[in-house]
Structure formats: structure tokens, C-alpha cells
């Protein structure tokens, strides 16, 4: 089954009892049991609920996993992933990892005895050099947030297996429509379902799946024991959003390429970070391991001091956090999504105060170009 079809018919796509083609919202906290210890598959909605289960089956199907897990936010899902590790374990993280993940690791997980080394994961030699005897996991974002670096997933998975490391991939930017890390040899895939999967800026959710039965059993335990499960309304909304993911991603990508090409030629722009451009250093790798380039990219202005005035002059591009909705968003990572990362570390990774990140929506492309044009005119 092709991905466009699987988005609609994958997982559990109808209600087994009534035949309803949209899985209902089972708005219940508990379930009648036939006898002590004998139930119909559900006991309590933290442990399991048919609406959430349908979503979990869907993400597993889309990514090639054995089981999926839905959490109350993307960070709740990442926390569950890192719960696999123990005190004394070491992790490799990307140098432009999402600020929330950086904060989770460096402010919370370090208290549990975990340590990390920050590297450029798109450089395989850096990964090999950074592996220690106590390294247990390699955490990857590809494309990365916000510099859109592309990491070779197959090569990383091979190196990880040589050293008995878990390979964890945040697939939020690419989505299952454009990239399937498990099929390239990795162990765990995480998504911030708030973004492209939901697609309408009305859900907060996290999804995790794995192709390893033993890991799936551990996630099953963590999800129930920690309790950060996704609510039923959000589970239903996310399933509805996923049905149109293919159509939306095609529109996002078409617009993103158009905007990126416009910016690359603009005299006030220094550099555009978009893997869909032939000038991107990992363009060929992105073409090889992805089926599209997503609608996310960043760019730097030649004058960093103009960045704030520029983004505040935009009208269609909404100044705000998040990404992946049908509406276009703009932000300055150094001052917003990545502000929790120390300035020196941000700048060393290339996240300057003048770096602007765009989540290109599905509006008419000409309207987006005109909005950018008028914002540039105001800072000229």
C-alpha cells in the first residue's frame, strides 16, 4: 500500500462494532468487567482506550513499527524514550537539537544521572569519536531544528549497531510521508504530533514507535506507569489530521521551495538552509533518504540586527512558536524555541540571533512572496 493510501486506510480505520468509518471518541475513564480479572481488552483509559489505540496502531503502521504510543505532548514522548536509560548512561545529541529537548536533558535528565555530548550528527566522524564505553544512545533530528542539517540514518544505524547503541530519530520535520527511519535501520522514531501530523495548530501530542518488541514492552510500561497519555479528543483530531497529511505536505513543500528560491536570490539574505535547494550541502543525501523536503527552513539576514524588525513586519507569516500548521509561521530560534540554550553554545552551532525560521503554510505562494517583499522593504 502506498503512503498516500496508507494515511487514510492504515491502522484501525473504522469502528469494529458499528462500522463507522471514523473511529469514535470513546469518552470513558473506565470499563465494565465481566468478572474479576476478566475484561474486554480495556480496564482503565490511562492504560488503554480504543480511540487512542487506533491512533497508536496508525503511527506504527505508517512508520513500520510493531506498536505505537501516544503521549500528552512531544516532550512527554521524548521523556518516555529517555526513560529507557539508567543513571551513568551517556547519550549523543545534535548541536542544533530542539531547545525543549536540550532543556529536558540538561535540566531534568542530568538529575537522574544521565550525561550527553553535543556534536554535529551530520558528521559521521564526530559520532564515532564521541562514543564512550557508557554511551547507550544516539539521538538524531533529521532534518534538524533549526538548521535543517541532514544526517545519514543508514550509516548512523550501522555505527550504532557496532557499538550496541539505540538509535532514536525525531521525525517531526519530515513526517512519515517523507521519511521512514525504522526502514533505514534505526530503533525508535518519535514525533511531535502537534506539528505536521495534526496540521491545524489545534492539538498538542507526542507519538513514539519502535520495530523492537522488547522496547515496545518497555514503552507500554512507561506509558502506563508515568501516565502522560494523550487525551481522547486530541487522539481523534490527530487521526483526522493524518488523513490529509499527504495533500498538505505536497502543498507545504511546493510553497517552501518557491519561498526558499526567492530568498536565496534576495540581496538582504546571506544564506538559506533548505535541503530542497541544490546549494544545501546535504541535498543529495536528502534526495536519497527522503521522499520530499518538508515545508521547514531557516535563513540568515546579512545584518543580524534587522531580524526582529523583519519578522515583526510580516503580516501573513504569523509570529509564533510551533510549526507544521496550514498557516505560515515565522520565528527567531535564538530568541524563541532555542532561547534556553546558552548563547555561546547556540552561536557555535550556527544559531545566530539573525537566524529566521519559517514554517511555510499552504496559502497561495504569491501572497507569501508579497508578504516577504513588503517586510524587506520596511527594513531597507
From Swiss-Prot:
Pfam families: Cys_Met_Meta_PP (PF01053). Its EC number is 2.5.1.48. PROSITE patterns: CYS_MET_METAB_PP (PS00868). One of its GO terms (cellular component) is cytoplasm. The keyword Metal-binding does not apply. GO terms for molecular function: cystathionine gamma-lyase activity; cystathionine gamma-synthase activity; pyridoxal phosphate binding. Its main location: cytoplasm. InterPro entries: Cys/Met-Metab_PyrdxlP-dep_enz, Cys_met_metab_PP, PyrdxlP-dep_Trfase, PyrdxlP-dep_Trfase_major, PyrdxlP-dep_Trfase_small. Its cofactor is pyridoxal 5'-phosphate. It is found in: Cytoplasm. It comes from the Bacteria. Binds 1 pyridoxal phosphate per subunit. It catalyses: O-succinyl-L-homoserine + L-cysteine = L,L-cystathionine + succinate + H(+). The keyword Nuclease does not apply. The modification N6-(pyridoxal phosphate)lysine is found at residue 195. Catalyzes the formation of L-cystathionine from O-succinyl-L-homoserine (OSHS) and L-cysteine, via a gamma-replacement reaction. In the absence of thiol, catalyzes gamma-elimination to form 2-oxobutanoate, succinate and ammonia. Belongs to the trans-sulfuration enzymes family. Homotetramer. This is Cystathionine gamma-synthase. It comes from Helicobacter pylori (strain J99 / ATCC 700824).
Amino acid at each position: 500500500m502506498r503512503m498516500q493510501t496508507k494515511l487514510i486506510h492504515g491502522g484501525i480505520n473504522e469502528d469494529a462494532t458499528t462500522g463507522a468509518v471514523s473511529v469514535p471518541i470513546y469518552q470513558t475513564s473506565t470499563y465494565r468487567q465481566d468478572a474479576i480479572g476478566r475484561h474486554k481488552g480495556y480496564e482503565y483509559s490511562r492504560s488503554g482506550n480504543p480511540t487512542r489505540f487506533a491512533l497508536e496502531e496508525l503511527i506504527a503502521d505508517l512508520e513500520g513499527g510493531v506498536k505505537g504510543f501516544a503521549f500528552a505532548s512531544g516532550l512527554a514522548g521524548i521523556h518516555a524514550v529517555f526513560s529507557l536509560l539508567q543513571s551513568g548512561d551517556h547519550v549523543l545529541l545534535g548541536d542544533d537539537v530542539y531547545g525543549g529537548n536540550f532543556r529536558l536533558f540538561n535540566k531534568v535528565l542530568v538529575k537522574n544521572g544521565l550525561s550527553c555530548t553535543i556534536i554535529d550528527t551530520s558528521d559521521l566522524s564526530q559520532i564515532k569519536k564521541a562514543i564512550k564505553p557508557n554511551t547507550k544512545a544516539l539521538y538524531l533530528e533529521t532534518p534538524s531544528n533549526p538548521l535543517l542539517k541532514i544526517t545519514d540514518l543508514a550509516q548512523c544505524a550501522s555505527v550504532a549497531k557496532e557499538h550496541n547503541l539505540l538509535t532514536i530519530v525525531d521525525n517531526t520535520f519530515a513526517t512519515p510521508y517523507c521519511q521512514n527511519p525504522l526502514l533505514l535501520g534505526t530503533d525508535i522514531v518519535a514525533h511531535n504530533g502537534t506539528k505536521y501530523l495534526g496540521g491545524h495548530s489545534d492539538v498538542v501530542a507526542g507519538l513514539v514507535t519502535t520495530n523492537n518488541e522488547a522496547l515496545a514492552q518497555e514503552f507500554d510500561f512507561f506509558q502506563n506507569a508515568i501516565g502522560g497519555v494523550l487525551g481522547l479528543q486530541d487522539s481523534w483530531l490527530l487521526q483526522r489530521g493524518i488523513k490529509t497529511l499527504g495533500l498538505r505536505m505536497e502543498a507545504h513543500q511546493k510553497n517552501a521551495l518557491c519561498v526558499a528560491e526567492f530568498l536565496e536570490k534576495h540581496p538582504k539574505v546571506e544564506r538559506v538552509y533548505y535541503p530542497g535547494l541544490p546549494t544545501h550541502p546535504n541535498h543529495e543525501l536528502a534526495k536519497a533518504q527522503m521522499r520530499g523536503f518538508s515545508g521547514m527552513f531557516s535563513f540568515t539576514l546579512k545584518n543580524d540586527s534587522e531580524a526582529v524588525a523583519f519578522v515583526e513586519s510580516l503580516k501573513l507569516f504569523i509570529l509564533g512558536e510551533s510549526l507544521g500548521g496550514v498557516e505560515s509561521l515565522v520565528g527567531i530560534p535564538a530568541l524563541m524555541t532555542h532561547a534556553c540554550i546558552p548563547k555561546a553554545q547556540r552561536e557555535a552551532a550556527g544559531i545566530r540571533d539573525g537566524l529566521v525560521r519559517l514554517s511555510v503554510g499552504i496559502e497561495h505562494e504569491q501572497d507569501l512572496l508579497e508578504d516577504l517583499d513588503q517586510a524587506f522593504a520596511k527594513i531597507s
